[in-house]
Amino acid sequence: SVGNVVDPEEMVKKYGADTVRLFMLFAALPEKELDWSDEGIEGAYRFLNKIYDLVGKIPKTSKGSRDAYVYNRLHKTIREVTDLMEKMHYNIAVSKIMEFATYLQKNKEFSGKKCFTDSVKNTCLMLAPMTPHIAEEMWNKLGEKGFASVAAWPVWDKKMINEKFDVAEDLIEQTLKDANAVKYLVRTKAKQINIYISPEWKYFAKEIALKNKKDPKRIMFYMMKDERVKRQDGAARYAVHLTKNIMQLKSLMPQKEEYNILKENEKFLSYDLEIFVKVMHANEGIGDRANRGEPGKPGIEIVS
């Protein structure tokens, strides 16, 4: 377009043909002209370097604590990218591959050798039509025979996809987001982060609220009739809170399941937050902060 003229040959010399091709596929929209961006091409260049580096970071351990999570995301990505490529929505396909590569990078310390290798290999094959040169280099470095360009396109396996991992990921991501927000607000050097699963009575209360979603006025009535809820400090306030926010309430994950997900991912949370994390039930904590959590939104305590 006028005022945004770029010499493709110069860009190829500087960044390589694969980077330019990837950027053009990512930035081009069917309904408008390509809008060249130096920041965009730099981003594509960094992404390809990052994805290439993954080949040299294959774990040595046979199994990882998050293999099932990674396989779930891998096969969902293959399914989505396959559909997008068939519909020629290349820009969204590139975006999905980038998202998965970032996810894989984040999970490399918690993936086993086979899981990580399968993930890198399939990412390489999905990239092959768009970035053939780097795909062939990755293919060769992985020790695969022949050429990536003529290898079979990845096939997603529905047995490897399980919605429970998506639900678990949502909980983990929300917890990380909340913990980072608290870290930012506290602004003191922390030694540890305690994550408190909500007291059990709040799960009973939320269950009552969800059952009365069509008639919120009855939430207080039924909560004050329930022996597990009414004797708790703050039960009336929580009933008011649930009534006010009834339309935002989502389905309820059992307390045991919520605890198990976060406890099993304690090391992953510590790695992401760059600080030791301990997941506990509310009754294991001391003070008010341990009881502030809600179902699906644990309490966060910074220990300095």
Q: Which residues does each PLM region occupy?
A:
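Catalytic adenosine-cofactor/nucleotide-binding cores of aminoacyl-tRNA synthetases and other
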Residues: 1-71, 269-270
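Flexible loop/turn segments at secondary-structure boundaries
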Residues: 7, 21, 29-34, 91, ...
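Conserved structural-core and active-site-/substrate-pathway-adjacent residues in large, well-folded domains
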Residues: 16, 51, 95-98, 132, ...
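Acidic, turn-prone loop/beta-hairpin segments
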Residues: 64-80, 98-99, 103-177
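Core structural elements
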Residues: 25, 46-54, 68-107, 197-200
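Short coil/turn segments at secondary-structure boundaries
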Residues: 23-27, 35-40, 60-69, 90-98, ...
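Structured, non-catalytic alpha/beta "coupling" segments that mediate domain-domain communication
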Residues: 41-55, 124-141, 281-292, 297-299
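C-terminal low-complexity, glycine/proline- and small-hydrophobic-enriched intrinsically disordered tails
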Residues: 35-42, 146-304
